[in-house]
Amino acid sequence: MGNNTFKSLTKLLDNRIHYVISHNTESKSDNDQVIYFDTLSEALIQANKNNAKISVIGGVQLIYDTLNIAHTIYTKITMYHSIVPLSVESDPDNVYFDFTKVPHHFILSSKNLGEFFGGCNIHTYTYTHPEYEYLNLIQDILCDGKLTQNRTGVNTITKVGCTLRIPLASNVLPVLTTKKVNYNHIVTELLWFLNGDTNSKTLSTQGVKIWDDNTTREFHANRINKLVTTYGSERVKDDIKIIEQYNEGDAGPIYHHQWRHWGAEYVNCDTIYTTGIDQIKRVIEQINIVKNDPLSPEGRRLIVSAWNVSDLDKMVLNPCHTLFQFHVLDGTLSCTLYQRSGDVGLGIPYNITSYALLTHIIATIAGLVPKELVIFIANAHIYTDHVTQLTMQQTREPMVWPTLLINKIQDIDNLTENDITVLNYKSHSHIKMKMAV
C-alpha cells in the first residue's frame, strides 16, 4: 500500500505484514508488521521470496504501477481499491487498465460511490493465459501445502485435491513455455504406451531415458525388498517369482499393458500378448457410438484405467496417472484425468502435454474437435529440492503455446511419430530438477 493509504488505516490488519511504499526517508516503524520500501518492485520481489499471498490496496497510482510490472515479478496478485474511475463501474468492459496482459485477480469496489449506483458493485477480472493454471498450482502448494515425508527419502510440500483446466481448441498443444520441455520425448513415450511395449530400452535407444532409473536390476531387487517388508514374503511370493525373472529394462505390467491387454497374465516385456481387453480400441469404439447417438448410455462410460489391483505388485511403479475418461459434447472431445500422485516439478508438465496429445489423437481418429483437458491431482506435491527452481519459474512470463498437426488416421495401431508435427514452440531456458526415485 501507499503511505497515505497506510496512514488512513484505523488499525493494523490482522495476520498481515504491511509493505508500505514511500519515498519519505523519514518513514519508519518499530512494529514488525510494518516494513517500508522505496519502490513497489522491491516490495513485490521480497514478498515473492517469502512465498507470500499479495494484496494491493491502493492508492490509485499504486494500482496502475502494479498492473504495469506485476507480470514480471509475480503470478497472481489481488488488488483492492474503494474509489475507482467511474468508467469502470458504468462500463466494466471499458476500463482504464489493460487487463489482457497482466496475471492478476482484480476486485474493484464502488462502495464510496454508492450514491451513484445504489450500493456496492464488485467486478472481478482474471488473467487467463492457460499456463497460469500450472504456475498458480505451484504457488497454491507452496503457500497452503504441508511438509511431508515419503518413500523416496526427499521431503515434499503436499496438497490434497488440486485441479487444472487446460484448453485444447484451435489445434493448440499445451507445452509449458516458462521452461524448456522436450516435447519430442513426450511424443515418443506416449507412442510407447500406445504400442503396449513395457521394455524401457525401447525408449533408451531413442534417447529417452526417463524410465531407466526405475527398471534397473538394482531397482527390481529393491522393489522385492520393499514388498517383503510391507506385506511379508508369503503374501507376495508369486509376484516375487515374476519380478525375479525380469531383465533390466522390464517395467512390468504398467500403463501400456493395462491399456492394451487388461487381464492378460503378465510374463515379461519380451512376451507377445494377444489376449486381454484392448481398452484403447474399446474406448474409441464407444466414442464413435456416442458421437452418432448422444443418448447412448456409453456417454458417461468412456473410461480407460491403469489401476489393475491384481497386477500392482508386479509393476516397477504403480500408475500415477491412474484413470482417464473422455466426454463427447456437441462434436467436441474432452478428457478428464484422475492422477493419484503428481510430481508438480517434473511429472505434471509431462502429463499435461501427454494427455492433451492423446486427446488430440483420439479426436482425430473419431472425427471430433478437441476441447479441454481437466486434470484432478489427488496428491499434488513439490519436492523440497525443486522449490528454488519452481519459484524462479514463476517469475517467467508464458509464451504462446505451439500448434499441433496430426495426419488423418483411421486406426490407432497405424500411428507413428511421422503423423505428429509440433510447430512454433518457443520457451524460456531449461530448468534442471532431479527426479526422486
Predicted regions and their residues:
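Enzymes that bind and transform nitrogen-containing heteroaromatic metabolites
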Residues: M1-H129
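Terminal, non-catalytic protein-protein interaction segments that mediate quaternary/complex assembly
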Residues: T128-V437
